């Protein structure tokens, strides 16, 4: 059982945190996350594709939905991206403002273009008032496909990231 007066009793509360390709905001204010992802696959196909993945950029949207509970007013919100090597940098930093009833909240939408230099798991760490709320994983996979050389053909052709799988 939760302690009386604990942070869990007061809010704000995390309702959702996810990565998707895009977010639709309907006229009635309802949001729809399109193509929720937790993996991006980068491919290189050719007679001699690179052994290691070349860096690439990828567009994605981070959706965070918070409900106020008893919290009111402005609260510092940030998201740090942690690479597979443990290097961290802020990718979203803003103020979440809570007003109204305890079931009211804020949708924080971070549209970003991220450069991926390495294969592995990248973590999106979500903080409110410097307290961790959650971590969202995104795995980057590199697929290298060697094809036989045909007459007049040379090298390789890097492919755009394939459709991510979730």
What are these regions (language model features)?
Residues 2-119, 123-166:
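Contiguous segments within soluble domain cores/interaction surfaces
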């Amino acid at each position: 059982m939760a302690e009386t007066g604990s942070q869990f009793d007061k809010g704000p509360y995390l309702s959702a945190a996810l990565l998707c390709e895009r977010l639709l905001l309907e006229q009635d204010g309802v949001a729809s996350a399109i193509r929720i992802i937790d993996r991006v696959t980068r491919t290189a196909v050719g007679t001699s594709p690179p052994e290691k993945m070349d860096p690439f950029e990828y567009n994605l949207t981070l959706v965070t939905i918070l409900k106020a509970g008893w919290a009111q007013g402005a609260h510092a919100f940030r998201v740090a991206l942690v690479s597979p090597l443990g290097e961290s940098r802020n990718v979203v930093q803003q103020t979440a403002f809570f007003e109204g009833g305890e079931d009211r909240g804020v949708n924080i939408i971070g549209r970003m273009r991220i450069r991926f230099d390495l294969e592995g798991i990248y973590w999106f760490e979500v903080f409110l008032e410097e307290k961790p709320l959650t971590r969202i994983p995104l795995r980057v996979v590199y697929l290298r496909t060697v094809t036989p050389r045909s007459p007049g053909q040379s090298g390789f052709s890097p492919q755009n990231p394939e459709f991510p799988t979730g």
